[in-house]
Amino acid sequence: MSSAHNTLESIKYRRGVLQLLDQRRLPLETVYCDITSIDDICCAIKEMRVRGAPAIAVSAALALAVVAERELKEQRQNSVWKTADDMRQFLLMSCDKMMSARPTAVNLSKVLIQLKKDIETDKANTMEAVLETCVQLAEKIYAADVSFNERIMRHGAAHLLKLASKERVNILTICNTGALATSRYGTALGIVRQLFYEGHLQHLYACETRPWNQGARLTVYECVQENIPCTLICDSAVSAVMKTHDIDAVVVGADRICKNGDTANKIGTYNLAVAAAYHKVPFFVAAPSTTLDPLTPDGEGVVIEEREAAEITHIASGGGGLQSDKSNSDYGRKRVVADGPHLKVWNPVFDITPASLITGGIITENGVFPPATAGPLFDISRIVEP
């Protein structure tokens, strides 16, 4: 895969330096945030400056390496850290802190748990050696996600073309699953990219994805940057577009895929899957193996993050529709919903799509896994070991 196809960088990293594209400001502004502390990365994740399950995990790993290098210099100057174990303790505590930043996406916890295990079992006996281990582990995670993207793109594009039995296909998606959500090309949107690069994409239909409008702000932004043919639709138009347009497949990303195939993804994905089943449009989930969670039996065991009411009740005057009271004070906010003592707002960030509605299959870097014709539809433990 040639990097010439893709100029977007949500993550800018070189040893000792990490910058994350502030995705709250897109598409109106392109601003990168410097990550120099564990508090910085936790804030960036919680406030959705960085978002997308793979990007969150990669950013956390790289942040740990960058912060460790900065802390080592400072602590040595102050004579606080004296042994390799002092540094290990800092790294382990930092992993625990980052793990709580967003609960639903499994990639973050899986990456940090693995980092903790590797750091704890590492035999390095100097602080410098512990740092080198941390940096190498983080950079390996970064490189692996790029490779996962490339393989998901190829597997998904080839399978969709074979399934559709036509030269050019129409795809429907939700949220943003492209370069802005991963380390490079994307998962579901990466497949769309591959189809486009090969001349096999007729058109992409992108849901706006309320309330943060990741489809309108981010997916459309990526498509415009690369001249990918795209039509933006309201979330409530998915049934209409499937009825009136020749949609060949729905392809979405995932924040967690349970052992039985139940999938947590951006709110509205469940609606999309129901509509796809009714209109007999194949529904696919595209995600790296780091998103697979064989330890959670089904969707009932997934903690669904809920965010503040202001994301629905307020609009921002200059931030492309960003509504968070806490994270967008610099944009200015205006309430557009009547208020009253009996009004309640429910704002779940994710929903669970039952495995029975994933009619096309699950696409990972290891291939395409269609639902079984007998027995359980999916058994994620057969795709990836826990």
Swiss-Prot record:
One function term, GO molecular function aspect: S-methyl-5-thioribose-1-phosphate isomerase activity
First-listed, main subcellular location of the protein, grouped into a coarse class: cytoplasm
Catalytic activity line of the entry: 5-(methylsulfanyl)-alpha-D-ribose 1-phosphate = 5-(methylsulfanyl)-D-ribulose 1-phosphate
Active site location: D255
Disulfide bonds: none
Locations listed in the record: Cytoplasm; Nucleus
Pfam families: IF-2B
Alphabetical list of InterPro entries matching this protein: IF-2B-related, IF-M1Pi, IF_2B-like_C, Initiation_fac_2B_a/b/d, M1Pi_N, NagB/RpiA_transferase-like
Keyword Cell inner membrane belongs to the record: no
Signal peptide: none
Top-rank taxon: Eukaryota
TM helices/strands, residue ranges: none
Pathway recorded for this protein: Amino-acid biosynthesis; L-methionine biosynthesis via salvage pathway; L-methionine from S-methyl-5-thio-alpha-D-ribose 1-phosphate: step 1/6
Any Gene Ontology biological process: L-methionine salvage from methylthioadenosine
Site, Transition state stabilizer: residue positions: C175
GO CC entries: cytoplasm; nucleus
Keyword terms: Amino-acid biosynthesis, Cytoplasm, Isomerase, Methionine biosynthesis, Nucleus
Enzyme class: isomerase
Alphabetized PANTHER family for the sequence: METHYLTHIORIBOSE-1-PHOSPHATE ISOMERASE
Function: Catalyzes the interconversion of methylthioribose-1-phosphate (MTR-1-P) into methylthioribulose-1-phosphate (MTRu-1-P).
Matches recorded under HAMAP family: Salvage_MtnA
Family of this protein: Belongs to the eIF-2B alpha/beta/delta subunits family. MtnA subfamily.
Stated name of the protein: Methylthioribose-1-phosphate isomerase
Originating organism: Trypanosoma brucei gambiense (strain MHOM/CI/86/DAL972)
